[in-house]
A protein has these predicted regions:
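Sequence/structural signature of beta-propeller domains
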Residues: 1-246
Length: 246
């Protein structure tokens, strides 16, 4: 947050959202995560990754990567059902505000590889209360050269939907689902010549070009260089340029 020079970090394992100063020291501030989204409510490795802050409304936004235990089986190859995530907002005071049902796409992969992850990994608030939500499918089969990722970015407008009631049962989520519009989609894959496999997990605003076009940045997590000498993940920053507005 530029207003107070704090860096807010979401913890995928412990479900805490904590503030730090730019020198790395704890700021002793934390968002009040509801028990329904707490550590015991998530499937391991599918907790909070996405975290964004809307400066216009002074609102934090977060969501778990995949479904909560209470909402059924996570979305994965062979699941055969729709999954809805609970998109949660917080005020600048750290207290929870409204939550909304986000409809997660079903995976494209037919089977899980040795390493697999799927779900929402980033949220980027836009002007007018809009949110860009990035979904990522990461699949590494036994044959590493077939490893690939699929990225999809959607736009949702929570203000145009209906907030979830307090403690809604999972079967109600579909009737509250937000409408989402596609923004962009692309894939990366491992290959011997010019490999571009990237585990993108970050999305943020970049610089504005001289002709007025916006840029946005995708940040890849290499998981410490996961893989072997020939086939492994790398840290990437991908620059995307919005179409020129006529």
């Amino acid at each position: 947050m530029p207003e107070d020079s704090l860096v807010w970090v979401s913890g995928e394992a412990d479900q805490r959202i904590v503030a730090y100063r730019t020198d790395g020291a704890p700021a002793h501030r934390e968002l009040a995560v509801p028990p329904a989204l707490g550590r015991s409510a998530i499937t391991p490795n599918y907790g909070f990754e996405a975290l964004g802050y809307d400066r216009e409304s002074e609102t934090f936004w977060t969501v778990t990567e995949n479904a909560l235990k209470a909402d059924g089986r996570v979305a994965e190859p062979g699941a055969g059902h729709g999954v809805y995530l609970r998109l949660q907002s917080f005020g600048r005071d750290g207290l929870p505000r409204a939550s909304y049902a986000y409809p997660l796409d079903m995976p494209v992969s037919e089977a899980k590889g040795e390493q697999y992850a799927f779900g929402v990994v980033a949220i980027w608030p836009q002007e007018g209360g809009r949110l860009w939500v990035m979904e990522r499918e990461f699949n590494v089969p036994e044959r590493r050269l077939k490893a690939r990722t699929l990225m999809k970015i959607y736009e949702v407008v929570p203000g145009s939907g209906t907030a979830l009631p307090e403690k809604p049962p999972s079967e109600w989520l579909s009737s509250y689902a937000l409408k989402k519009e596609p923004v962009a989609a692309f894939s990366t894959r491992m290959r011997l010549v010019r490999p571009n496999l990237a585990n993108y997990e970050g999305l943020c605003e970049g610089s504005r070009l001289a002709d007025g076009r916006r840029t946005w940045l995708l940040v890849s997590d290499s998981q410490g260089g996961y893989g072997n000498r020939l086939c492994h993940l790398r840290d990437w920053i991908r620059v995307c340029v919005s179409p020129k507005v006529k």
